[in-house]
A protein has these predicted regions:
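Phosphate-handling active-site elements
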Residues: 57-69
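Active-site signature of cysteine proteases
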Residues: 11, 29, 151-341
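Papain-like cysteine protease catalytic cores
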Residues: 67-175
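Active-site nucleophilic cysteine motif
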Residues: 40-54, 93-100, 287
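Bacterial Sec-dependent N-terminal signal peptides
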Residues: 1-20
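Second-shell loop/turn segments in exported
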Residues: 31-43, 86-94, 214-221, 230-231, ...
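Active-site-adjacent bridging/hinge elements
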Residues: 18-29, 76
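Sec-exported extracytoplasmic/periplasmic mature domains
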Residues: 50-59, 107-111, 236
């Protein structure tokens, strides 16, 4: 088939996806995915993208799963609320994060299928977070303790997000606890977290110094050429990639027919230039998407990214980032270790 693809929260801009006359677009095959979702007014792109990557990885293996972001959001908010309570309101509740945080929460709390706990379409996570903080401040003033706090939180979450599923979930006739289901979705050590910066030695792991790395996840540091090779190899062998990077660039805010490029002044993209962008704070950890394919346009490589801003954005929820854009603006990538062998 011929493919024309046109802050973390949903942006209302619409991307035109008409291929310019005279452009040569090479045919491509996209990795199979679950339906595009819409994170709405929430900063949960990291959860949507990492779950989407896991879902596509399972589809590739002949297994179909569709996972609940709402469950993770609820578990995270409850945990953050307890931290807020014990800090006497000095530790703010933030729902931002990085892709590996999703794995952290799955390992800790398990996961449930999307059908067991769906996203409510009209919920505003920013408003819910403020309600949680208000509830916690009252709890601090009253010194009610954790059990009563959790009881009040659960009533709030039930009202705003819907009632939690039973302690066991059912999938293809089998019965699982959320923890057991999580082990079937993402076993420990299944994914590798990768980055590429020169202020730490290559070949070593370090906690990325980004504000959203709340759980201090560590990433394997590799040269950018090697990171790009890992991404290409994964995609060419049918494995999705969870991409995390900067979308504040002019090329992303105003893509040309759904294709995103760096500015001519930013070429060539090198290890040194991406380090300068990061250290000058021009490359920031803005957004997370799932890479599901590669495409060649006028003999230049682009990576097809599945977003979480609904299927009315871009080309049915997708956009193409150039290889130079990835080289310059990637913060991190999460890839199945099977794809790295």
């Amino acid at each position: 088939m011929t493919l024309c693809i046109c802050s973390c929260q949903y942006k209302s801009s619409h991307t035109s996806c008409n291929t310019p006359q005279g452009s040569v677009v090479q045919e491509t095959k996209l990795i199979s995915t679950t339906p595009v979702k819409n994170q709405g007014k929430s900063p949960l792109c990291w959860a949507y993208a990492m779950l989407a990557t896991m879902e596509s990885e399972h589809i590739m293996k002949g297994d179909s799963v569709n996972l609940s972001v709402a469950y993770i959001a609820r578990m995270m908010l409850q945990e953050k609320a307890v931290e807020f309570y014990f800090s006497k309101g000095t530790k703010p509740i933030s729902m931002r994060g990085m892709a590996p945080m999703l794995i952290h929460y799955i390992n800790k709390y398990g996961i449930v299928p999307y059908d067991s706990y769906e996203d409510k379409k009209d919920i505003d996570m920013r408003v819910l977070r403020r309600k949680v903080e208000f509830l916690c401040r009252n709890a601090i003033a009253q010194q009610i303790g954790i059990e009563k706090l959790k009881s009040r939180l659960n009533r709030l979450f039930d009202d705003e997000m819907g009632y939690m599923p039973a302690k066991t979930v059912y999938m293809l006739g089998a019965e699982y606890t959320p923890e057991e289901f999580a082990n079937s979705v993402c076993f420990p050590g299944e994914y590798e977290m990768l980055t590429s910066f020169t202020h730490h030695p290559f070949g070593e792991r370090f906690a990325l110094e980004t504000p959203d790395n709340q759980t201090q996840e560590v990433f394997l540091n590799v040269p950018i050429d090697q990171l790009m090779q890992y991404i290409r190899n994964a995609i060419s062998h049918g494995h999705p990639v969870c991409w995390e990077g900067d979308i504040s660039e002019e090329g992303f805010r105003h893509p040309r027919h759904g294709f995103v490029d760096v500015l001519p002044s930013q070429l060539p993209t090198t290890q040194a230039s991406r380090q300068r962008e990061f250290e000058s704070l021009r490359t920031t950890d803005d957004h997370v998407m799932e890479i599901i394919g590669m495409i060649s346009k006028n003999h230049r490589n682009y990576y097809v990214c599945r977003n979480s801003w609904g299927n009315h954005w871009g080309k049915a929820g997708h956009i193409c980032l150039s290889e130079d854009y990835l080289r310059l603006k990637t913060i991190a990538a999460v890839i199945s270790k099977e794809a790295l062998r």
